[in-house]
Amino acid sequence: MTDKINVAIIGSGNIGTDLMIKVLRNSDILEMGAMVGIDPNSDGLARAARLNVPTTADGVQGLIGLDNFAAIDIVFDATSAGAHRSNAAALAPYGKKLVDLTPASIGPYVVPPVNLEQHLDGDVDNVNMVTCGGQATIPMVAAISAVTPVAYAEIVASIASKSAGPGTRANIDEFTETTSHAIEQVGGAARGKAIIVLNPAEPPLLMRDTVLALIGDADHDAIRASITGMAARVAEYVPGYRLKQDVQFTAIPDGEPVHTLLPDGTGPVTTKVSVFLEVEGAAHYLPAYAGNLDIMTSAALRTAESIARRIQNTIPAEVAP
C-alpha cells in the first residue's frame, strides 16, 4: 500500500476546519500532519487536538518548528491574502507545495474542472484557488467559451452573511479583483467583472450565483450542452452544486449600449446568456447554507489530491534486496 501524503492546514477558522474534516473523512490519499492557527482558543485547534492532529498556535513559524514538519509535502493556506504572502515567503526555502485558498494570487489560478491538469506538471509550487464565487462561476464561463467567444462575463455571488467570517470580510476587494482576473484568465472571457453580496436573511439562504455572458451568434444547443456537462463535472466533487434554472438566451435589442462593457477589438454581441446556480454545502463542519465555503474546500481538496498523486508517482519504488 502506498503511504498517504502528509498535509498541513494554516488557518484554524471556518474554512481550515472544514477542510481538515474533509481530509480526515473523505481522502484516501491525504493525511493530516498539522493544524496551524494563531488563536490558542480557536475551535479549529481544539477539534484538531481531539482528533489527534498535531497543532500549533504559533502560526507558520510554529509549523516550521513541528517535529514532523519535514514529512509534510503539501500546505493549505486558509488565512487571508496578506497573511498568505508572509506564509509563502516563510515556507519558500522548504520546497513545500502550497494550495492557497486566499485571494493572494501568488501562483496560477486553478479551477479543477477547467485547468487543474495544466498546473500539475513543471515547477509550480503555489496554486491559487481563486475565490468561492470564482470556483462556482468560472466553470460556467469556461463552458460557454468552449463553444463561442465570450466578449464580457459578469458574475454575482450571493452568500449568507453568517457564512462570511472575518477573513472573507477582510478580503472583499481582493475577492472582486481576483475573481474578475480569473474570469478572464481561466474562464476565457475578454473582460470579466465580479460582484459579491452578503445576504443577511434569516434563516440563512444557500449560496446563489448568477453568470451573465455576452456573445455573438452561436449554437444555443451546444452552449446549453456544454454548461450542463460542466455542471456535472463540478458536482462530482461538490454534490450540492446545481443549475437552479434552465440556461436562458436573450437577444440584445438594437441600440442597447452594451459596447460600453466590451474591450476594444471584441464584438459585435447579439445575445446575453444567463446561468443561475445554487450551491448547497455538504455540512461536514459548516451548515449546509455555507456552500460558498464548501466549494472552496472541496476544490482545494481535489487539487491537493491530484498533486499528491503526482508526488506518489515520483517517489522511487523501494528496490528489493
Swiss-Prot record:
Annotated catalysed reactions: acetaldehyde + NAD(+) + CoA = acetyl-CoA + NADH + H(+)
GO biological process, one term: catabolic process
Gene3D superfamilies per the UniProt record, alphabetical: Dihydrodipicolinate Reductase, domain 2, NAD(P)-binding Rossmann-like Domain
Coiled-coil stretches: none
SMART domains per the UniProt record, alphabetical: Semialdhyde_dh
SUPFAM superfamilies: Glyceraldehyde-3-phosphate dehydrogenase-like, C-terminal domain, NAD(P)-binding Rossmann-fold domains
Keyword annotations: Aromatic hydrocarbons catabolism, NAD, Oxidoreductase
EC number, UniProt record: 1.2.1.10
Gene Ontology MF terms: acetaldehyde dehydrogenase (acetylating) activity; NAD binding
The keyword NAD appears for this protein: yes
Active-site residue list: 132
Binding site for NAD(+): 12-15, 163-171, 292
InterPro entries the UniProt entry points to: Acetaldehyde_dehydrogenase (IPR003361), Acetylaldehyde_DH_C (IPR015426), NAD(P)-bd_dom_sf (IPR036291), Semialdehyde_DH_NAD-bd (IPR000534)
A Pfam entry, by short name: Semialdhyde_dh
HAMAP family: Ac_ald_DH_ac (MF_01657)
Family assignment from sequence similarity: Belongs to the acetaldehyde dehydrogenase family.
Name this polypeptide is given: Acetaldehyde dehydrogenase 1
Organism per entry: Rhodococcus opacus (strain B4)
